């Protein structure tokens, strides 16, 4: 048998060079077309469109398109053109980048480093004479000793990877078990020791005492309360925190014995998740009007408020359950720290402390924005908060310590402002920090980094992008709702991934900002509030008293500012959608798709809840365009009798029952957005048992298993999407069980992956594992924090000075 040959993997530069040799004329023609467009940035579709139009015969076209250079173009995320050069940013797979530059006149090819590529890109703004002494940010050296996976499929599973690494290190070197002993010995609550006392000073002693304790407890009934053998364990070196019954104490001691003998990832994660570490949690969300009533729809106030209120209710329930099982008599505390707004617009945002309904130990703590002129009384945009955050962090820290009678155990930041304040607090207090971005603005505004000066007067992105970099690198762990939020898809760049390398010309150049392979990334998806969103089949819980108002909303013949259009055949199922009325959410696209699909119009009625109906009531330019488009569609396609348009609804309880009412009609939910970061309405609808059709662009593609628990639709191919919907309803007409089959599969998917219970369990476990990792990797973290501290003081604070303070008058 012949020996297999080793072949060299060609670099991007080599592949371009080879294509130049094989298809010189075609490639020169193509690259010349790029150069002829002049200086600028070309997007992926521009690159492919030119490829399609430049080539002559089909054979040559196929050879070039399917060859090495064609593959490079298909994986290029952008091209920078500065004649006679064309530079490509090539992304072979999520998280992996290469850069190459071609001189079209000389036909020379060179591989570029990240720094060289960004410097070339800066020529779009600064010309060829940019400052050679530009500040470059590079966090890679600080993470050299941090283990990380190499496969793109491992991104977002950081805790699993970290557990494998930690258990492997412990298995290979028993000396590495010492930090675990130290970690257990430092646990105290208000000065009282938990887990271990001074009688256990070494690993060998711990193993001996564990064996004695297990022997003692195994003779007891599993239900024996901890108090009945507490003093016996204390004499052996064990304090409270192991469990409330003999059975739970024994389970936890077995886990620790197994770890000391032969560490494995699942045992380590389970054990660290059971260690009592988190009693006081602080959640930061400074901007907007944060309240429990009359706030949704106010500026900068929406999904983040709903997310946090649902989050804390689930988190408190999980904390109480864990504390009880740990055998502790401790009341947890959760503080949502937000801004106090004296001019509160009829909300409770001027109250310092407010208990969260449905909880016993969770409060909203409001702290005002303060400057040298005094307290700021009015709301300000989230883009203008930067001058206030440093003082706010100090003031809020004092208020928090006063409320908790000590420092918190765990801090969670939300959005750019909350994450920066969380970073300042966590750095000062030395506690575990979790970051939740919700949205990273850099990805929402194309080219807002390279052309930051064009945006800065209005949005102050130089401050925001800098704050985001500081927070994501300071955080002990980051949670996202989807994989795509971290690393995108094969054809799109992830929100965090876009912060790996970018430049703000004249300010600084980021050559290694964040690594999406970092094990700090974890996907922890939220759910729907199951007190509001529950299956249509749970008849005893149904809010039947609301059915009258729901029927009025759906079927009333009156045409008002609240609803237009009528449904003449009430026996038809309802295809339902609910979203903001803007271009991205694409509600008008759904209406147009329905309008043009005769078969779908025969099978179902369409109901949408979106925005304003009266154009005079809207101040949003994008919404105004969509309102006019909706009215034109109704008129041009004669939709009256089959279509109902209802204005935006903020009553969540009624919205929950509305989903179930739609399910009673054997209807379905549609989410037609061009892009949806997560898709909370998709989760809400599926939780109520509604079969769901949702965009394949973004989070819903991960929520729904196509053809099983719902259906993916592509809003860029509306005819195909309409046919998928029509086929479903036609099949349901022939086989009524098909509707229930999809409904049940959707519910099963939710219960397995998308509930607040799963979320809170996971979050608490992550707090334990990363708390331990923070403890055992102090030195590496200290180096990173010093670098961040310097960047904050020398760069961020100067940028903040460029943001004008807001006046109350």
From Swiss-Prot:
> Gene3D superfamilies, from UniProt?
1.20.120.1230, 3.10.450.330, Glycogen Phosphorylase B
Picking any one GO biological process from the record gives: seed maturation
Listed GO MF terms? sucrose synthase activity
Q: What is this protein called?
A: Sucrose synthase 3
The record describes the protein's role as: Sucrose-cleaving enzyme that provides UDP-glucose and fructose for various metabolic pathways. Modulates metabolic homeostasis and direct carbon towards starch synthesis in developing seeds.
EC code: 2.4.1.13
Pfam families found in the cross-reference section: Glycos_transf_1, GT-B_Sucrose_synth, SUS_EPBD, SUS_N
Reaction catalyzed: an NDP-alpha-D-glucose + D-fructose = a ribonucleoside 5'-diphosphate + sucrose + H(+)
Annotated region described as GT-B glycosyltransferase, given as residue ranges: 277-755
> Record's InterPro entries?
Glyco_trans_1, Sucrose_synth_GT-B1, Sucrose_synthase_pln/cyn, SUS_EPBD, SUS_N
Report the family membership: Belongs to the glycosyltransferase 1 family. Plant sucrose synthase subfamily.
How does the activity vary with pH? Optimum pH is 6.0-7.0 for degradative reaction. Optimum pH is 7.0 for synthetic reaction. Optimum pH is 9.0-9.5 for synthetic reaction.
